[in-house]
């Protein structure tokens, strides 16, 4: 297993949305994931220090004809946890995010997430992005656990309803 850290840079509106899938990531990954509120005027100092130290990349979509990114040497991934519209704004208004290495993932198919309007055609929700990232870094067991939780989240008849997250053992496998 490859040891990875996920930082969810979260827009303030996401903290109260029942449709936010970042909470699933925090629940399944435990100490391997953190959530930091995004603030336009005060970048998170600790995150800036980690970016400066290296091994950090922003997971952010590129053009559809870009090859999948090489993850060699990366152990810490930043994901903007917000709507696609807000994610673009956050990226544009955060010079430190524009300077960090940017990677894009090539998902095997379309997003299964349909709980929000105005979704980007080729975009993934936060949980789906982390699932693909975990798979790409060899963390298959944790990816499967997160996928199971995500599928239960989007199909309430087969598990907890939207916004209902049952506690689980949070450990990377």
Feature-to-residue mapping (PLM):
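C-terminal folded domains that constitute the principal catalytic or ligand-binding module
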Residues: 76, 85, 89, 93-173
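Cys/His-rich short segments
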Residues: 1-3
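Active-site phosphate/pyrophosphate- and oxyanion-stabilizing loops and adjacent acidic/basic residues
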Residues: 23
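S-adenosyl-L-methionine/SAH cofactor-binding core of RNA-modifying enzymes
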Residues: 27-92, 96
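Short N-terminal binding/cap micro-motifs at the start of the first secondary-structure element
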Residues: 15-18
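Residue-level signal for short, function-critical loop segments
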Residues: 10-12
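A structural signal for short, well-ordered beta-strand segments and their strand-loop junctions
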Residues: 8, 58, 79, 103-104
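Conserved beta-strand segments of alpha/beta enzyme cores
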Residues: 5, 32-34, 101
């Amino acid at each position: 297993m490859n040891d990875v850290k996920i930082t969810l840079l979260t827009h303030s509106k996401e903290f109260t949305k029942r449709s936010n899938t970042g909470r699933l990531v925090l629940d399944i990954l435990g100490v391997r994931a953190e959530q930091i509120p995004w603030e336009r005027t005060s970048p998170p100092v600790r995150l800036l220090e980690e970016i400066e130290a290296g091994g950090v990349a922003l997971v952010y979509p590129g053009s559809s004809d870009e090859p999948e990114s090489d993850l060699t040497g990366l152990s810490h991934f930043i994901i903007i946890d917000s709507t696609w519209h807000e994610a673009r704004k956050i990226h544009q208004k955060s010079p430190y995010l524009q300077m960090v290495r940017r990677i894009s993932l090539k998902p095997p198919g379309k997003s299964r997430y349909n709980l929000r309007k105005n979704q980007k055609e080729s975009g993934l929700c936060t949980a789906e992005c982390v699932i693909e990232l975990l798979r790409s870094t060899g963390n298959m067991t944790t990816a499967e656990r997160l996928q199971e939780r995500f599928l239960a989240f989007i199909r309430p008849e087969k598990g907890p309803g939207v916004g209902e997250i049952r506690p689980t053992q949070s450990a990377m496998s």
